[in-house]
């Protein structure tokens, strides 16, 4: 039997990552695997170390939700706060609430831990507000906390919520994964919402000086969610602008929808300083997804006297977006396009993103071409760059190219592909394969995790399936990587400031946690003979390849990595094993690419962009932080819509039973991903009534005390829907049985 001294040692080592989730002493018992006879010693250890728990109540932070906060779904440890805990230090961040209603502030750097905010220190802030926080000390050596000094920027102006009436007062309740609050609401004449109906509301008064805020109903949305209401809920609460400013639309309206061609192969741009090369005779094609709307890139592989050249033509967005104009300001504020299953919120007005900038087939388009020669061994040489004019021969899809290439490989006649293009695709496949091998040789990480594709019909999700990943995808990926790298090397060699795409190596503590988890799953000693991080990660991926834990090792590996970002420093790209890398190939949908296009033109001698280079030199760091943040905002919005859409989809199949596999564990249960449709849901341990289960973080399992039934990653289960919450994008499953064979095998 373990005594108080044992438990004090255990708590010093293990309490920190668990503390936020422990809201009753019973939670501590489960997390630590405390036997009944050890509970007195464990409580004494808790008390001696200042871990206060109210055993009579559900927890000091409100009602128990049965699952852990979204930000704490199993992930690897974050880095230290870099001195941000010192008393008096002030930091800016975004206020959010955990699922238990506990306020925290998320700082701009994703590597820094969140700041805890007690309820009495919230001031007048609402969830999603950008706030200034001052660190303050607690008595008795307890961890410091944050006090909100002021609201820097309001996070929500409009929101989708449920209308209700209570005590004769009308209100709208807003709920998502980060917030849950209600505001009194006014209902304009002509609108008559029913209790429980979804409405779009606008906040007219924010809570200040003890006064409660107020809202007004703007639009009625019906009783049930659709893809439209989900998209509206996410974009409004996350400040994703759905409309362009009037100035941007007026500016876009003045741009001719077609490209006027001057005679001659090399003519200067109108009001420009660089010759534009006429490449319309070359067989450029675009290869994109079937539902793509904007075509940034076209590719062409030509052979001249036994020498091969790859040409990557990218939409010349900088020609159409004047520096400092309203389109430019709107695009910078957005930072990126946002893609949902059934719609896109573009960075540029549609007349540009889907019109004159998009490389549609059979029409003249202005581009920037990267021309890369290959030697006889198939190795790329020094690239050249030029403004260009192309006319795409065909708009191909990944499916088109995959079907054509696989039919040839299987000995059947190629599909309906023009001869010249078909032959070019076959040669492209060979060159892409060589590039892929070279990438592996230099130590780049390469692992595929299936992504879900949601099919929408009639405004509702009708199907969720794994998106295919074929050689046609890899072909374009390799060519874009090569073009981006060529631009980064060219600009760096000439000393021009621009935004690099930076991916730093994972922190050592993240690596240790990943290797510890991987070793448990694979029952294999940690790989210590390789000292560099990349080799260690690739060794673990290789050890798992082809086995039942391959997916889980890849998921853990992905979570151990740092987030990529933009910045003016040349810090390398860890995942690609490149010293210098940038984003150049998607200027229609990414503002950093537009920056790089402008700097490239300056490097090629276009004097119009010389002042812009000085701007990048002075403000590159600030721009990188802003654009990295907008990228994360877009990714969060896309994930939020996907989670809600999956919850809506699975709610229509409430009577069915599914095969799934455990993907991860928490102190409150475990997550299961369905084999059929890649929908993930949570199984609260409290829903298992056949035994008393104890959680062992060391062994990575939930284990039944009596029946010894074990739940651990990789275990196959039969489950059915217990609850689907579309507002929060949360799904709960109920276990109805086990399966012998591992799913996804």
Language-model segments: which ranges?
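Electropositive polyanion-binding surfaces
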Residues: 200, 206-207, 233, 247-695, ...
